[in-house]
């Protein structure tokens, strides 16, 4: 359901985007031109609807009901974030030209994209950043603008029907010509521009990430009356438009930084053809050291005759030429979303559409002239398919190291100088351990951590804080002084585990276990002939990895280390999107496998894991079958007195009854890394107790005596009660002894109030 819903969202690139382009910015800039409406607005009241699909609810979808046009419509939408951090880095200059960096808090979870249930061509683009819903709906080829009604105490909104015939766009064209493209090619060749190569192959429909750096010129800063907050607000509205325009190819544009020329333009901006190389040079000197990015664009409040922008073609991962210019002047404010999406298309390698290019409308996104259509043509798709495999930067999500986190009390992250951080004021009111000042409450010893209990106290030493997950994992216990559980440790790589497997990185890996994880408990490793037949092909169903964007055929000695091949598959599993199950039958042998192609953002279920047994004293490492003795470890079972196992730090984890560090003396078990359990023996302990020294247990001897005493006491009490009952019965008249219990009396009934939620089914 989620996949279907998201696919529908990605497919709905229709005329709504033109209206969104017009109306997104009319709320943040004083419009010199606006959409025309058909008649007066309707008053609507959005009502929250409980999502019936559990998958959609978990995926972050929410639904609202709106009644207009004589019928009820259900709007399903999902938040679209285009900032990697709420603390967006913003660079400005003072009067002396000194660069300053600020990290203002930016609300980024109030922009939504979605659709209207029951209409495959519908689309919704809404924001709640400014109170209520504001944005565009398209239903049955009709566009509507929605905005909060003011004043209103009942969440009322006004819904306007847009008159598409009266709403027109000003004719403009892109500054990129055939001659300009030829000059760009010569410039890049002369400059020996480095094109980052990628190992990503079939990226299609698995998402691209463009990390964008934006620069705002001085005229736009003055136009916003030197108010950086308004400039940031403008940029966020533009970002929503850009992402909507590029949804059809699953391109995510992420803003990593913003620079505002607050002290004048450092380069002339009047000539668009001179400005493009000048800006690229400026950014190389001034921007590269500030933030990481894939492309940088300059927003200029200047009219370049009839040109709306220009960019270098195919330079999205090129640090020298990865840039573009976008005009945001005068009545072109309402077209900025289209402009930036168009110029980013050039950065991605798309040229202007020719006469053979089509998208089902009169013109497409990459038309040389400005138009209302935002669909990509067949020519643009061909460019993406052919050239994006060589752009490694856009296949990677932004790294955590690229994201700055402002150290401040109240962000929910415990940082230097803080005892705790309960986050928002609402969370702090519910928190019994931490105060809004990021200090612990009176008598509280801790706030978070697996060794901090509900009373804000540190758990006693020996309290189990992390149970083992499997036979290759180890448990950890609190040490009594820290609120944190010790580091998550596991059994040393190379240790034998069930199924003729070996522990490796906390997993017991074997072909049978692997098949069961993918195809169910009845599945098992297929015949070696399957591995030989398929893994030597070198395709997405059988290979030994990738080199230079090509599948690698397995050598005969490595066939058991390529892709998993299974047999005895009773039922087909329900797998994530983009997986394909492959079945081959030859020479009375069945082989089941899954595919994986480069660019998929989900884990590969079918690659054989390191540590899997591939022969006597051989294991798979990096798709090669190597000798097991390649694991050289200082810790062995003999090191642990044969009373424990070695952990991944090559220290002994002792059995219950023996004490670390070497399991030579009696104790409670554990290790110097994981801690030790208390006197109580935990069922989650990983090792066997059979070798623990025997100790006399007094309780075992006392249990029979206690049981006999309890039984005798119960029998004595029962005999006394029976005797008294007989004496009382003998003293009653005969007629009373035979009277039915409810004779002459009305039975009583208890009235039970149903739960509140039953009142309104």
From Swiss-Prot:
Gene Ontology biological-process entries: cell differentiation; prevention of polyspermy; proteolysis; spermatogenesis
Glycosylation sites: 140, 227, 301, 378, 390, 479
Topology Extracellular: residue spans: 35-697
PTM summary: The prodomain is removed during sperm passage through the caput epididymis after the protein has reached the cell surface. Not processed in the secretory pathway.
Topology of the protein relative to the lipid bilayer: Single-pass type I membrane protein
Paired cysteines (S-S): 323-393, 357-379, 359-364, 465-485, 635-646, 640-652, 654-663
Residue stretches making up the Disintegrin domain: 406-493
Protein name: Disintegrin and metalloproteinase domain-containing protein 24
Provenance organism: Mus musculus
């Amino acid at each position: 359901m989620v996949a279907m819903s998201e696919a529908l969202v990605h497919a709905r690139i229709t005329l709504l985007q033109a209206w969104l382009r017009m109306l997104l910015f009319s709320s943040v800039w004083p419009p010199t031109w606006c959409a025309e409406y058909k008649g007066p607005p309707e008053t609507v009241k959005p009502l929250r609807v409980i999502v019936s699909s559990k998958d959609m609810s978990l995926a972050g979808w929410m639904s609202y009901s709106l009644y207009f046009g004589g019928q009820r419509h259900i709007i399903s939408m999902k938040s679209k974030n285009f900032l990697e951090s709420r603390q967006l880095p913003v660079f400005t200059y003072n009067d002396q030209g000194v660069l300053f960096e600020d990290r203002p808090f930016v609300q980024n979870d109030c922009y939504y994209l979605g659709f209207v249930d029951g209409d495959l061509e519908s689309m919704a683009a809404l924001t709640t950043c400014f109170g209520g819903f504001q944005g565009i709906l398209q239903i049955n080829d009709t566009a509507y603008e929605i905005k909060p009604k003011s004043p209103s105490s009942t969440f009322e909104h006004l819904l306007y029907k847009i008159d598409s015939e009266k709403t027109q766009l000003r004719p403009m064209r892109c500054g990129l010509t055939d001659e300009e493209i030829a000059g760009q090619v010569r410039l890049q060749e002369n400059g020996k521009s480095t094109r980052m190569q990628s190992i990503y192959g079939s990226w299609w429909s698995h998402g691209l990430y463009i990390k964008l750096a934006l620069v705002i010129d001085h005229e736009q800063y003055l136009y916003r009356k030197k108010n950086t907050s308004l400039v940031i607000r403008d940029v966020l509205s533009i970002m929503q438009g850009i992402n909507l325009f590029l949804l059809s190819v699953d391109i995510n544009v992420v803003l990593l930084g913003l620079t505002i020329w607050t002290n004048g333009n450092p380069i002339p901006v009047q000539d668009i053809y001179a400005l493009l190389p000048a800006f690229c040079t400026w950014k190389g000197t001034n921007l590269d050291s500030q933030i990481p990015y894939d492309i940088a664009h300059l927003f200029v409040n200047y009219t370049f005759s009839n040109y709306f922008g220009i960019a270098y073609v195919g330079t999205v991962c090129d640090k020298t030429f990865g840039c573009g210019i976008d005009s945001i002047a005068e009545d072109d404010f309402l077209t900025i979303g289209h402009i930036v999406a168009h110029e980013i298309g050039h950065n991605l390698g798309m040229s202007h559409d020719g006469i053979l290019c089509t998208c089902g409308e009169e013109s497409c996104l990459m038309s040389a002239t400005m138009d209302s259509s935002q669909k990509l043509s067949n020519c643009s798709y061909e460019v993406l398919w052919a050239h994006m495999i060589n752009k490694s930067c856009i296949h990677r999500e932004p790294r955590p190291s690229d994201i700055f986190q402002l150290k401040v009390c109240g962000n929910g992250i415990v940082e230097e100088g803080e005892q705790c951080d309960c986050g928002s004021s609402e969370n702090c009111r519910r928190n019994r351990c931490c105060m809004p000042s990021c200090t612990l409450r009176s008598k509280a010893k801790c706030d978070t951590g697996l060794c901090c209990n509900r009373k804000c106290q540190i758990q006693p030493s020996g309290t189990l804080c992390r149970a083992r997950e499997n036979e290759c994992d180890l448990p950890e216990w609190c040490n009594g002084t820290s609120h944190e559980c010790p580091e998550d440790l596991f059994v040393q790589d190379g240790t034998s585990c069930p199924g003729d497997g070996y522990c490796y990185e906390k997993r017991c890996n074997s072909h049978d276990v692997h098949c069961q994880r993918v195809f169910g408990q009845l599945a098992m490793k297929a015949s070696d002939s399957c591995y030989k037949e398929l893994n030597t092909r070198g395709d997405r169903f059988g290979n030994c990895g990738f080199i230079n964007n090509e599948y690698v055929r397995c050598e005969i000695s490595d066939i058991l280390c390529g892709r998993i091949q299974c047999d005895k598959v009773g039922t087909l599993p329900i797998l994530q999107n983009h997986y394909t199950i492959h079945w081959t039958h030859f020479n009375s042998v069945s082989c089941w496998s899954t595919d994986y192609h480069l660019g998929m953002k989900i884990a590969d279920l079918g690659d054989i894991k390191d540590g899997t047994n591939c022969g006597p004293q051989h294991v798979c490492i990096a798709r090669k079958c190597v000798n097991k003795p390649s694991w050289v470890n200082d810790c062995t079972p003999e090191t642990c007195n044969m009373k424990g196992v070695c952990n991944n730090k090559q220290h002994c984890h002792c059995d219950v009854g023996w004490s670390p560090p070497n399991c030579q003396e009696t104790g409670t078990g554990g290790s110097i890394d994981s801690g030790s359990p208390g006197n109580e023996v935990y069922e989650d302990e990983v090792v066997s107790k059979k070798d623990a020294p025997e100790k006399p247990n007094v309780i075992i001897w006392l249990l029979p005596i206690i049981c006999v005493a309890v039984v005798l006491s119960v029998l004595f009490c029962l005999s006394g009660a029976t005797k008294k009952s007989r004496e009382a019965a003998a003293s009653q008249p005969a007629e009373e002894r035979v009277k039915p219990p409810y004779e002459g009396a009305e039975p009583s009934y208890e009235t039970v109030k149903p739960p509140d939620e039953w009142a309104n089914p």
